[in-house]
Every structure is written in C-alpha cells, then in structure tokens.
C-alpha cells in the first residue's frame, strides 16, 4: 500500500443531465453559478481535483454542454487550491492550441490546471462536427503523439517533432507553464493501457470490483516499469453515502428503476461498438450490464454505496491494490460532496493512519 494519502476528484457537471441516465430527481445543475459553489465546497471538503467533461453534441441526457477548458478556468478563478483537469479531444483540438491555452491558464492560476486526453469513443459526435473518425488503435496513436507534443512544447525551445499526425519545426512556446501540467487519460483497451504505460502521468479506469481493478493496476504498472515510466491510477466511482446501508441501497434501486431505457440502450450500443473496434474486441463497457450503464463510467461497480464507514473501508481496500485517486460522481453534487467531506473523508484518513502505524510497528 502506498504511503501517500489517497486523493479525491469529482466529476464536474458542466453538461446537463447529471451523471446517471435516469429520470430520478438530481439536485445538480450544469450552470456556472452552481459549479462555482460546488468547486468551493469540494475544495473545503478536501478534494484535490475536479474533472470537467468534454461533449460537442447532445445525447443520453446531456442536451447542453459547456466547453471544458473555458469552464475549467472559471472554476480555477473561483478557488485557490483545487486543481482542475480540463478534458481535451484530439482532432477538434490541435496540440499547439492546447499547449498555449493550458500554459496561459497555468500561469494565471499558479500551476493548478491539468489535462485529460480523451481519445474519443462516440463516432456520431465526430461526424456531427466534421471530424475524421479514426479506427480504434489509430485514435490512441494520435493521442500519444498529442501527449508527446504537449510535453515537448512545454519543456523545450525550438521543439521539433515528426509524427504521423502532428509535426513541429523549431517551435518555441513562451511563456511556458510554471511547472509541468499533469496529463491524465482513460480507456480499458490494450492500446489505452499501453499508452498510459508509456506517456501519461495518470490513468483513469472505469468502475470495477477490487479484484478487477487490481488486475488492471498490476498490468499497467508492470508495463510502465518495463518502459522506465511511472503512472498513477484513478478509479471511477459513483458514491451513494447515507446514514444507513438500507438508505443507500434504496437510492441505487430508485436510480435504476427510473432509468431511461431508450437512452441507456443507445449509450450502451455506441459505447460497446467503440470497444468492439479494438483488436481484442473489448473496451471500457464490454462487460457492462444495463444496470451498470445507467451510470456512464460503471461507477456502481466500484461499490462505494453504503454508510460512511463502509465506503471508507472500501476506499482503503482500493488503495491497498494500488489506486491513487478516487474519481467520484454523486446524485446531488453540492450536498453530497459536503457530506462526503464531513463523514467519509475523515474516516479514510483515520484508516490510512492506522494502516501506516501497523506497518511501522511491523518494521520495528
């Protein structure tokens, strides 16, 4: 188990519809006023990161979508310590533009911007905005070149790069970022994991059981070690923390009972089609059931559903298999982020301290 405290991030609801494809009431709003307050509450609660979403088209409840980089900057302006991860989609974005945008925001916010490189899974979105749709592994090859380009632009003067997708000739960006913005990515395919093991600082996995997550962590870390690279792991989880386990399970049942079948099935078809395009025929949602797909990132599978004590124990179990960060979604963001900070996070820190004391005693 890592001696570093597990970190916490939350999904920013900068698109409408919340994080579940359900008709259940979600006391969550996609507007900037709601999100500014949410960012401040999350910062006070002990969250280190917030992750904005990137969507160009409506679908599956997300009728309205704020652009991720501009929205990230607005949240950074409303906080003082929170790091915000801006989602960027290669294709619509070019590395030079992204590098300059992020370097400027980094300068303006004392180094608190990070980036999530989204390789793309929704073919219809690319077609709608006139972007060429690459085959599965080609999308990850492009993303890797995008990341290598960002790193080069941020760290070198007269940067020169000859790739299949991007080329630079003696390009110098000034000013550069204050430090090196962290680079995140997701994906469960072989191509995604191999990319993380070569170039990314962080790898997000979809929700899964502790055993399933351990298998992914072990695979990626072994590959990274062979590449003399280090990568940290974040896991998706939809958190339902209530005073009793019965209350939490009842909320989960209500979410699923009130799911929008047409939207869930349409999302599932698009997501699984993207996964089947990988050489191994799998992706993030290959084994997801209808109930799993009600939450976009398989967040129910991680099972952070129950009392604060139960959830804290499960988070520490995730940490024990190599998870460095929990990326949390909620039904009612503001009130539940606050509850999480008051009731769950202190228990996590207490359990971490006990585990550290036990390790110290064993060494002694």
Swiss-Prot record:
GO biological-process terms attached to the record: alkanesulfonate catabolic process
Keyword check for Flavoprotein: yes
Disulfide bonds: none
Top-level taxon of origin: Bacteria
Keyword terms of this UniProt record: Flavoprotein, FMN, Monooxygenase, Oxidoreductase
InterPro entries membership: DMSO2_SphG (IPR024014), Luciferase-like_dom (IPR011251), Luciferase-like_sf (IPR036661), SsuD_RutA_monooxygenase (IPR050172)
Family of this protein: Belongs to the SsuD family.
Protein's UniProt name: FMNH(2)-dependent dimethylsulfone monooxygenase
Gene: sfnG
């Amino acid at each position: 188990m890592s001696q570093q405290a597990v970190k916490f991030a939350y999904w920013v609801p900068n698109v409408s519809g919340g994080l579940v494809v359900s008709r259940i009431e979600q006391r969550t709003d996609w507007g900037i006023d709601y999100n500014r307050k949410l960012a401040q509450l999350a910062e006070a609660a002990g969250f280190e990161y917030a992750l904005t979403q990137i969507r160009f088209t409506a679908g599956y409840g997300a009728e309205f979508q704020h652009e991720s980089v501009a929205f990230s900057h607005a949240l950074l302006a409303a906080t003082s310590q929170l790091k915000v991860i801006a989602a960027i989609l290669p294709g619509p974005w070019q590395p030079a533009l992204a590098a300059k945008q992020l370097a400027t925001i980094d300068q303006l916010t004392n180094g608190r911007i990070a980036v999530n490189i989204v390789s793309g899974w929704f073919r219809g979105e690319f077609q709608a905005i006139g972007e060429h749709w690459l085959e599965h592994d080609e999308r990850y090859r492009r993303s890797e070149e995008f990341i290598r380009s960002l790193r080069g632009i941020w760290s070198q003067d007269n940067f020169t790069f000859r790739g299949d997708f991007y080329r630079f000739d003696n390009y110098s960006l000034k000013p550069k970022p204050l430090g090196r913005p962290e680079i995140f990515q997701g994906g469960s395919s072989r191509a995604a994991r191999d990319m993380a093991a070569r170039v990314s600082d962080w790898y997000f996995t979809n929700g899964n059981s502790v055993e399933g997550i351990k298998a992914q962590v072990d695979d990626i870390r072994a590959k990274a070690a062979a590449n003399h690279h280090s990568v940290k792991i974040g896991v998706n989880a939809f958190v339902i923390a209530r005073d009793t386990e019965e209350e939490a399970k009842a909320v989960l049942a209500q979410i699923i009972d009130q799911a929008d079948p047409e939207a869930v099935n349409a999302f599932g078809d698009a997501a699984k089609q993207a996964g089947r395009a990988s050489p191994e025929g799998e992706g993030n949602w290959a084994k997801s059931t209808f109930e799993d797909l009600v939450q976009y990132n398989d967040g129910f599978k991680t099972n952070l559903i129950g009392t604060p004590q139960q959830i804290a124990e499960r988070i520490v179990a995730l940490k024990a298999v190599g998870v460095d960060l929990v990326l949390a979604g909620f039904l009612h963001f503001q009130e539940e982020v606050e509850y999480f900070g008051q009731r769950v996070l202190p228990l996590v820190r207490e359990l971490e301290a006990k585990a550290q004391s036990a390790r110290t005693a064993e060494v002694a």
